[in-house]
Amino acid sequence: MKLDKLTSKLNEAIYNAQASAEKLGNPEISEEHILKEVLSQPDGLVPLLISKLNLSPKSFLESTENALGKQPKVGGNTSADVGFSRSAVSLLKAADEVRKELKDEYLSTDHILLGLMKNGTGSLKTEFLKLGLEYHKLLKITLENRKGKTIMDDSPEGKTDALAKYAKNLNELAKQGKLDPVIGRDEEIRRTIQVLSRRTKNNPVLIGEPGVGKTAIVEGLANKIVQGEVPEGIKNKTLYTLDLGSMIAGAKYRGEFEDRLKALLDEVKSSDGEVILFIDEIHTLVGAGATEGALDASNMLKPMLARGELRCIGATTLKEYQKYIEKDAALERRFQPVYVKEPSVEETVTILRGLKGRYELHHGIRILDSALIAAATLSNRYISDRFLPDKAVDLIDEASSKMRIEIDSMPEELDRANKRIQSLKIEREALKKEQDTASKERLKTLERDLSEQEQNFQTLKARWDLEKSKIGRLKQIKEEIEKYKNLEAEAERRGEINRVAEIRYGKLVDLQKELESANEELKKQESASRLLKEEVSEEDIANIVSRWTGIPVSKMLQGERAKLLLMEDVLKTKVIGQDHALRLVSEAVQRSRAGIADPNRPIGTFLFLGPTGVGKTETAKALAEFLFDDVNAMTRIDMSEYMEAHSVARLIGAPPGYVGYDEGGQLTEAVRRRPYSLILFDEIEKANPEVFNIFLQILDEGRLTDGKGRNVDFKNTVIILTSNIGSEVLGSSEYTSEEKERLVEQRLKKHFKPEFLNRIDEVILFHSITDSVIHKIADIQLEGLRQKAKENGLDVSFTNELKDYVSKAGFDAEYGARPLKRLIQREVGNALSRYILDGKFTNGQNVTVDYRQGKVVVVV
């Protein structure tokens, strides 16, 4: 017997047996030690063979461990003396005899068990016989498992039953009802069957965008095969999906991955076309396992694919097909592309109706049909970087999951009552310590109040528990119906007509009646008095879309409607003297939120014109604060930074091959992250004329393609462009309003191309600030300063004399409101900062800022 011709698993078992003997203090390595290690190997051959005989490997392991416990033990250091016992040597010799009979090159773990059952003489063989293990049955299952192969190298474990180890049986999953139903997609499934039925190159590859349902088509094919709804050519075929991860995992040595793949391919080949292999993300095979001098997985597939020995279905995205498969012309010609297009909104609704039952069953809730329609339409409109039906299914799933969590959590009403009880109990404990009459009276009142609250809480809790149990019962009945439907389908496949009739016209009818009565019982409870909601509506879907994208698509609450109607008035408190501009901006936002605006264009695109300091940028800030409750919630792009033609790359991202390609553009990335936003392009006349070309598709169709070829959606943005063109005309008092408009229009046409101007919704002229509004602007600026002082613990008020002074001294018709801002900062701000730094004030102190004798002074 050659001990150098052992498989790696047997080598490992003998090494572990020696370590085990040393640890237990046994003087020798016995057959029990070896068998214990052989039976303990989780991915070994011996446990697999015992399982295939419908016996429990655990029972055999326990018997072996019991026998080990009876072994003699010695004290002291045994490591130097541990050798093989007679029984172990006999076992290895018996195993070697079996190896020779089976014409194997290497001694393996299955030979050990076969040797024991054939020539073993010890008590362990008797125990194993009692457990039902017989030599001839074991030999038969071993030969079946090998499929006519012999052990020619030291790692046979990875090559036996490769399909069971490295692939999943989709037919089995379909029989168990674990695959989701596939609705529609009949054309693609038919095309896949056509390609599979060819004599050679019968390998379809499903190509489509991520999330359009490529894997679902294969699952649909598995369902059709199981139901027998396929042509004769692929009837009774078994569909396996390759698990590349488990094939690569644990392949430590060079060539081990190739061995496993070869074994799997040989198994598929030897099935004589009975097995169809599905490889999801097939591009991962290109380059998989390739090291110096080794073939990659795709090259190992090529000969079998070309000869038609391997029926394979691949699935990959358009981008990856182009990047990996098309590069390799030899691999590409062996596959027949089947293009899977994105379904339309109507088709998506049909798909969702088919899946609805599965999601209702999983979450234990009901999904209204209006929610399915909303999921398809809203996801199509607002989630532009993903594809149907995946994004619509995700919306349904998340809305259902949110509702399930709400059912399982304590309702708000109950939670409030519980918190009230806790606070009353704390107060009661405090009052018990008081001795005065008032406290004792309060304690009596509190006890009554607490008793009422607890009673109310118990009533609410009983209602909640009842509603929960009713919803839970509904889920239970639905699960029962699903179970019996699967049993019915299985019985129908086996041809058990009586069983089918018993389930279809007996059990299922009873369960359906039970479901209807449970639904009626739940509906009887008035919706007003219900604590729990178990229906997913379109409003729930809209809320999820809003959470994902930040776009307010849910129905407007009364408060929001009132706020939008008052939008113009709110903006007027922030921007003074530009009422016409504020009205036009407010109307655009109101149209959008009411759903009247064109859905394929931005909410509003405005060109603000006017001299410096009249409130163009301030209007944009006020609008951002109104819409998003945050002044900084706008993307501001200063166009003076884009004076060169090449600087457009900074907006949309550098093209491939240039530095910064992976970083994306400043504009496109900002909008991708926040689709509902305000974008301010400040001082656009400073930019290079070439830069304006990218505005054309943004302003017209509400989209822009970035440097990576991705479409960025601008349909939910407000776009404001500001410019100083014609500011000298608008700031002049020489012209009438009509003349100003005409002159500004001429200058605009001179500076911008007609196609750019034609795409802007409104050109809004901001007029110079007059002395009549400067007082109001001064009030706003001083209020800002007062708020800053308040944060530092100083309560400031301003006298009318001071307001008159800053209004007069800060007014400049040419420069607008900015000189006023600078004056307030310089004179009033400096006076306050000196007062604070002197340390003269105490926290919360009231001070007045006044203008006296030509100076700004702080008066306590």
UniProtKB/Swiss-Prot annotation:
Region of interest (Repeat 2), ranges: 84-148
Gene3D superfamilies in alphabetical order: 1.10.8.60, Clp, N-terminal domain, P-loop containing nucleotide triphosphate hydrolases
Chain residue ranges for the region called Repeat 1: 6-71
GO BP, sorted A to Z: cellular response to heat; protein refolding
Subunit: Homohexamer. The oligomerization is ATP-dependent.
Entry similarity comment: Belongs to the ClpA/ClpB family.
Protein name: Chaperone protein ClpB
Organism: Leptospira interrogans serogroup Icterohaemorrhagiae serovar Lai (strain 56601)
